[in-house]
Amino acid sequence: MPVHDASSLAAALSRTSFMDVFQRLDHAVLESLWSEGDARSALEAMVGNPAASPDTRFLAAEILFAKVPGYPPPDAVENLAAIYADALRNAPKAMANPWGMPGMQDGQIAQHVLLLGEAAIPALRAQLDDARSVTFSGSKEATFGNSYHYRIKDIAAELIARIRNLPFIPDIDPAGRDGAIRKLAMTLK
């Protein structure tokens, strides 16, 4: 999949997925997307373009995190916070593994949100009422993660607590987590 300019890179991103680029053992897709032309500038432009599709912006950001040491620059953090909040809103459409399991492990995407720091909190705050379920795949991780019935708001709460260095220990019961999430939300007002 050689890519020669910004428009063909955008088209290539629209035809692929996070799983294709980051979760296959063969990283040929990532390398192909990165190797042709001025991929960095094109990807940065996509991240900053509100007219680009949310999925394209998110995938462009993930590639930049993977390929550019020290990414993101300070002037991109607020924009990235909105992109990642949108990705979390869309998490039920995909497997949740890259977000990690609250209280247990950070996934690749969660690590990137944590790097955004305080700028991510307003966008994540809006997710604390989203009770849609997320699904984990695999064997051990899926069995454990899905038994907890994690939701978008659980992941958002975990990320906010980590950014603010606040306690958040996910209860096995969603109703118990709801109480902890309400307490966390009160600290954000």
Give the location of each predicted region.
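Extended repeat-based scaffolds of very large eukaryotic assembly and lipid-transport proteins
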Residues: 1-189
